[in-house]
């Protein structure tokens, strides 16, 4: 058989498959009234994957116009049911454990990165205990102690990094913020011993491990691809670094160092069944803490600096807010070192962070596997167990319905619009401390329900100290001829600005005010 004939048959087969697929979709809509509408697509298996992957929010808003808040699309062969709006957030993110499951969705992606027997590679009851263990580093006293550590890391970086050599220059801000935030997360959440190991080798390991979060690993987490080989080697090396620290302490009889850090805390922890936390799990929790503490902060701090560079007047407003509200007891009347209590007097700093989180949440989709058929209240729909549920809290955050002129970055909007992420009447305890479910709010930058980010207070504090410190020392502006901010890069699980994203910086004449 000649190649032209083979090509003709292949084309006919492809057309026939598409025709059958379109016919199936037509019959599905006509005959199956208990399923949400299926987003039209030409190619089976691929479905809407490309549109969703390139521009998830554009995809969500487009589908909402056609199908309403509830619809199903095909994501690499997997029926994925989206439920938008505050009711959708409540339905998915506050679903019962017996009905929805995060572990089955995320474990294939996260386990090779974080390690076994932690986070999504263990029963939810065990994860809750692990969250209790790490609250040591997230207590009020710990947060207060983190402030000078974070401030010092930022000041040291601005003083010594080649990115900020001299009195002015240009910088690829996502690259710089990635370095700053790994240092701040390491210093505050990991302790002095680990921070001292954040060398060039560790940075390379972190980068290789981070590449494990590429979206293809949802489908092929164990494929022998180059980035997966680097991921596995980086995980093994990083785990050995933590294990060496633990063994060194045990051999020296120093299980409880004079200055208790997170590793020392975890070495004392015991599960409810009486089992001490194994060293392997300590290492894996430490890896998780480092990556979780750095990821969102890196992306959001980059967006903050890009937004400030696009509106230099706001940079000066922030600086003047510090001069007007903080003590000036430093040398020559300069601003004093930052303290935790200072941020109660810096509302614009908080609003800049809040507004940037609203527009630039680093995770656009939150997924849950359906475990039991789920009736959707107020609709004829029943979601079958073959589906994955998808919540997109960022959709309400980007909707004019809740935030007038929603696509504009305006920190001052929060002066008249109360933050709705915490409702005192919506408090629940999932086993690791009382917190707001948050599912009824249109603003959920850290998720909601039992999987709401436990480290959001640290994230806010980390960002606030970074922003306040950088504003004290630097002015920012866009490069000549540039306006606005870069587009969003959705190629990774954690979205961020398209790289490189360069801005201009200028050092202030007085170092601290």
Curated annotation (Swiss-Prot):
Heme binds at residue 453. GO terms for molecular function: heme binding; iron ion binding; sterol 14-demethylase activity. Keywords: Endoplasmic reticulum, Glycoprotein, Heme, Iron, Membrane, Metal-binding, Monooxygenase, Oxidoreductase, Transmembrane, Transmembrane helix. The keyword Thylakoid does not apply. Gene3D superfamilies: Cytochrome P450. Coiled coil: none annotated. It holds the Pfam family p450. The chain crosses the membrane at residues 8-28. Its cofactor is heme. GO terms for cellular component: endoplasmic reticulum membrane. Its main location: endoplasmic reticulum. Its EC number is 1.14.14.154. It catalyses: a 14alpha-methyl steroid + 3 reduced [NADPH--hemoprotein reductase] + 3 O2 = a Delta(14) steroid + formate + 3 oxidized [NADPH--hemoprotein reductase] + 4 H2O + 4 H(+); a 14alpha-methyl steroid + reduced [NADPH--hemoprotein reductase] + O2 = a 14alpha-hydroxymethyl steroid + oxidized [NADPH--hemoprotein reductase] + H2O + H(+); a 14alpha-hydroxymethyl steroid + reduced [NADPH--hemoprotein reductase] + O2 = a 14alpha-formyl steroid + oxidized [NADPH--hemoprotein reductase] + 2 H2O + H(+); a 14alpha-formyl steroid + reduced [NADPH--hemoprotein reductase] + O2 = a Delta(14) steroid + formate + oxidized [NADPH--hemoprotein reductase] + H2O + 2 H(+). It is a single-pass membrane protein. PANTHER family: 24-HYDROXYCHOLESTEROL 7-ALPHA-HYDROXYLASE, CYTOCHROME P450 FAMILY 7. Sterol 14alpha-demethylase, encoded by cyp51A, cyp51B and cyp51C, that plays a critical role in the third module of ergosterol biosynthesis pathway, being ergosterol the major sterol component in fungal membranes that participates in a variety of functions. The third module or late pathway involves the ergosterol synthesis itself through consecutive reactions that mainly occur in the endoplasmic reticulum (ER) membrane. In filamentous fungi, during the initial step of this module, lanosterol (lanosta-8,24-dien-3beta-ol) can be metabolized to eburicol. As a target of azole drugs, plays a crucial role in azole drug susceptibility. This is Sterol 14-alpha demethylase. It comes from Aspergillus flavus (strain ATCC 200026 / FGSC A1120 / IAM 13836 / NRRL 3357 / JCM 12722 / SRRC 167). The lineage of its organism: Eukaryota, Fungi, Dikarya, Ascomycota, Pezizomycotina.
């Amino acid at each position: 058989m000649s190649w032209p004939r083979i090509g003709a048959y292949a084309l006919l087969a492809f057309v026939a498959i598409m025709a059958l697929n379109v016919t199936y979709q037509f019959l599905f809509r006509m005959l199956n009234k208990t399923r949400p509408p299926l987003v039209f697509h030409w190619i089976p298996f691929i479905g809407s994957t490309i549109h969703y992957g390139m521009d998830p929010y554009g995809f969500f808003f487009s589908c909402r116009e056609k199908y309403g808040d509830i619809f199903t699309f095909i994501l690499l062969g997997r029926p994925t049911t989206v439920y938008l709006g505050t009711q959708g957030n409540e339905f998915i993110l506050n679903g019962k454990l017996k009905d929805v499951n995060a572990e089955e969705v995320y474990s294939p992606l996260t386990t090779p990165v974080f390690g076994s027997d932690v986070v999504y590679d263990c029963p939810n009851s065990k994860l809750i205990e692990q969250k209790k263990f790490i609250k040591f580093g997230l207590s009020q006293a710990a947060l207060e102690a983190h402030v000078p550590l974070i401030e010092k890391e930022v000041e040291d970086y601005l003083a010594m990094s080649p990115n900020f050599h001299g009195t002015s220059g240009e910088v690829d801000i996502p690259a710089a913020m990635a370095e700053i935030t790994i240092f701040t997360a390491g210093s505050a959440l990991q302790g002095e011993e680990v921070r001292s190991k954040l060398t060039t080798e560790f940075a390379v390991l972190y980068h290789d491990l981070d590449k494990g979060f590429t979206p293809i690993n949802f489908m092929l987490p164990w494929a022998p691809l180059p980035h997966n080989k680097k991921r596995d080697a980086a995980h093994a090396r990083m785990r050995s670094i933590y294990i060496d620290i633990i063994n060194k302490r045990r051999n020296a009889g120093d299980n409880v160092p004079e200055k208790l850090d997170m590793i020392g805390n975890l070495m004392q922890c015991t599960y409810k069944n009486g089992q001490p936390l194994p060293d392997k799990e300590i290492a894996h929790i430490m890896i998780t803490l480092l990556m979780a503490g750095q990821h969102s902060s890196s992306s959001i701090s980059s967006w903050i600096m890009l937004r400030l560079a696009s509106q230099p007047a706001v940079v000066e407003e922030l600086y003047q807010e510090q001069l007007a509200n903080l003590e000036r007891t430093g040398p020559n009347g300069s601003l004093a070192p930052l303290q935790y209590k200072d941020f109660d007097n810096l509302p614009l700093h908080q609003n800049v962070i809040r507004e940037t989180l609203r527009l630039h949440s680093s995770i656009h989709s939150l997924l849950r596997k359906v475990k039991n058929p789920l009736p959707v209240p107020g609709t004829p729909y029943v979601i079958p167990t073959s589906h994955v549920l998808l919540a997109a809290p960022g959709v309400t955050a980007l909707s004019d319905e809740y935030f007038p002129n929603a696509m504009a970055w305006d920190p001052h909007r929060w002066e008249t619009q109360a933050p709705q992420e915490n409702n005192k009447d919506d408090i629940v305890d999932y086993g690791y401390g009382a917190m707001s479910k948050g599912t009824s709010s249109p603003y959920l930058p850290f998720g909601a329900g039992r999987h709401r980010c436990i480290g959001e207070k640290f994230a806010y504090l980390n960002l606030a100290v970074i922003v306040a410190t950088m504003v004290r020392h630097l002015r920012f502006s866009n490069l000549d001829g540039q306006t606005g901010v870069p587009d969003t890069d959705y190629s990774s699980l954690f979205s961020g600005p398209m790289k490189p994203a360069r801005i201009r910086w200028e050092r202030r004449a007085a170092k601290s005010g």
